[in-house]
Amino acid sequence: MEDALIADEQLDRYPIGSDPWIDSLRDIDSDAMELDDLDVSKLNVEQAVRLWSRLSAWVEGDQVAYYVKDAPLSSDAAYDARMNCLKRLESEFPQLDTPQSPTHRVGGTFSNDFTAVRHPSQMMSLDDVFSFEELRAWYDGVRKDLEWPEDKLLPMTCEVKIDGLALNLIYRNGVLTQGLTRGDGVTGEDITMNVRTIHSIPTNLDGPEGDIPDMVEIRGEVFMRWDDFHKLNEANEDAGRPPFANPRNAAAGSLRQKDPRITAQRHLSFYAHGIGELVWGSGKPVDVADEVRNQSDAYTMYRKWGVPISPHNREVTDFDQILDMIEYYGEHRGDIEHALDGIVVKVDDLALQRRLGSTSRAPRWAIAYKYPPEEVNTKLLNIVVQVGRTGRVTPVAILNPVYVAGSTVSRTTLHNAYEVKRKGILIGDTVVVRKAGDVIPELVGPVIAKREGHEQDLREFVMPTRCPSCDTVLRYEKEGDKDLRCPNSESCPAQLAERVINLAARKAFDIEHLGDQSAVALTNPEDNRPDSVEAYAPGVREIVVEPGEEPAPYLAPSGLELPPIQEPVLTSEANLFDLEASDLRDVYVWREAQIIEVRRHVDSHGKERKVRHRLGGSGLWHREPAFWSGVKDAPLKKDANRKTVKDSEGNPEYEVKPDAVIVGHGRNGRPRIEEPTENTRKMLDEIEKAKHTDLSRVLVALSIRHVGPPTAFTLAKHFKTLDALADASAEELEQIDGIGAEIADSIATFFEEARMPGNWRGRVLEAWKAAGVGMSTHDEGLPQTLEGKSVVVTGTLEHFSRESAKEAIERRGGKASGSVSRKTDWVVVGANPGSKATKAEELGIPIIDEQQFDTLLATGDVQ
């Protein structure tokens, strides 16, 4: 979000691919994600060898941790990024491509806890792709290798990629004799006793004797259903044990128990997805293709034997159907019974599979399309408490920034102190962060294996008993609550700042340039004020050091005093609409001076480069104007041709805007001015425009507890005016579809309190009415031109913000979708569109511009 405050200077790591970048790589997720941007063709041999050595060591360590110890050290995203980079390095520098490379290994080694057993036939892995382009290249490559006619359909199967553990079941004469882990693909661990406790795995194959082979290897995946996973974690919590981070870890820990009785209690499940060696009555191995024509026939055979198959498998015949499968389960990842991380595509015909063959680790006839990672690992730097707009006091995890599921995550809520304890997290832990779809990021839990050797760096979180903003004693609202609250709703600076942030949100008044920092500057400008003059360093914005150096000690000048405490411009949201530029001129905020390390390196052209690296805060603070510029020269006035405008005497003229203040003159009489920043001007313009908004947005802006945008929309549609809503009783409100007793009581209580003499909520309502804020709905009788239609907006539109475009679609009965799929009816493309426009072209979805969008809103069509 844009903000009226001056943003910190952007500082970068070393240039990707440079020597210092290679040497500074760490085995953390944020560094691993940079590997995707590396152009390996620009590396020299020495650089490639160094990078390969670092990555291969980490990948080997990850393989042992994942496959042998069942205690992953890295997230799937980081592992995939490192493995993918190794493959690209080996392709560009063939001398690195040796049989010992981790890219040629199927999994890990095997542990000493179970007997090592050789698989009758190698248990292979799958190659991964991460984009439609890579998937298309594989698909086209398969057709080319098979010399498949362009006009002929190529049957394939699509299967959800279960996030579990690979298992090889060996049946002899229909009896389960062994269950083996994948291990390194050649040798696995014998966990037969534990496998026998999994109810979905038959100990005897069903069917007449002639239909059962002498020996068969059935490959599949052991997993834990979401319901069973949640029950297991609840049981762990009740017993005081830490919860599992995800179902895969839970399944792994359960399957490899030394005591099968524990495995039996964990309710594991199994789906078959492959076939290995097959021996029939003659006693001789028979190629599967001679007995079963295709992959789907094998699954039919399994079902007859009583072996479970995933109900999500599909048979497809073209690339578009593959995309349909990927898109569907991409949108419904959380709706099926187990965790999944991709879609597996296989050539269905087993004879064609044999023709295509395999590499040393993976078949060429199958590929795994991996969805963007929903889980990554990162460092928990701290836990702070945040006071919300309704007084709820929430612990917030401060994270080492990491990219997950489409965005960078640096903080996430921990809900309450009970939740912190339940998850078993300590400040300093490496933690798992999950972001499924568009939901708020969740801190799942700690990576326990990462604690070893770092115990001294870990500490427990302690929940405060007083409000960190106003020092009011915190309390529970009612018995049994887990959430502490600050009861000082009127005067708590943190609550006021959060309410201002809320009213500026897209779904409220949509004041884009009133961001978080501006809200704090308006309501609590002394936030971060240092406790003593020893930490006050006027004018010091950064402290530059050489690599390895510590900043020199700071000594405050003699006689220096902290400036007087400022009174906030806003003591209530009531006077928001009365703000003028002049009110903001003397608002200053506290900024911490940053420690900047300047690193030097020589680029590929022999030229010395400097890279500025932010090390963190220095503990020294200075003040900066929040909304106005500092004193500066007035700019020269320019004409349409960008030439300086001069007066009749030939002297240059200067640009002094009406809201600027001339504070003096420099050389040649040039005015010295102070003026609002452009962001400030935009913020004030947006505040003025917000007066003319719809009632539903006003209701969101009022921060009524339990009233979010959907409820506000329902209320505005039902009551039409604020006065009518304010007069409604809780009983009347509860009669409205979608308004439950708790919401109805909250709304009625809000307006009852607002009517009390002197109540601050009443003052807000009266002030907004006096300022001309709209208190009625705008859409009565609006034609439902887009009913049942799905519209995606991408890029910047001239006359619509993203939120107002979404609102325009929804008010006409349409669905404003955030992603493009085959169900999308139109994609509206503005300036600088993203990948959604490209995907729309690939899928043949109609693309329209803003003018056509106006027509669409009015008529329901673009003709």
From Swiss-Prot:
Biological process, per Gene Ontology: DNA repair; DNA replication
Catalytic reaction(s) noted: NAD(+) + (deoxyribonucleotide)n-3'-hydroxyl + 5'-phospho-(deoxyribonucleotide)m = (deoxyribonucleotide)n+m + AMP + beta-nicotinamide D-nucleotide
GO cellular component, one term: cytosol
SMART domains membership: BRCT (SM00292), LIGANc (SM00532)
Biased amino acid composition, Low complexity: 241-253
Binding site for NAD(+): D76, A77, A78, Y79, D80, S125, L126, E159, R182, E221, K346, K370
Active site: K161
Metal-binding listed as a keyword: yes
EC number(s) reported in the record: 6.5.1.2
Name by which UniProt lists this protein: DNA ligase
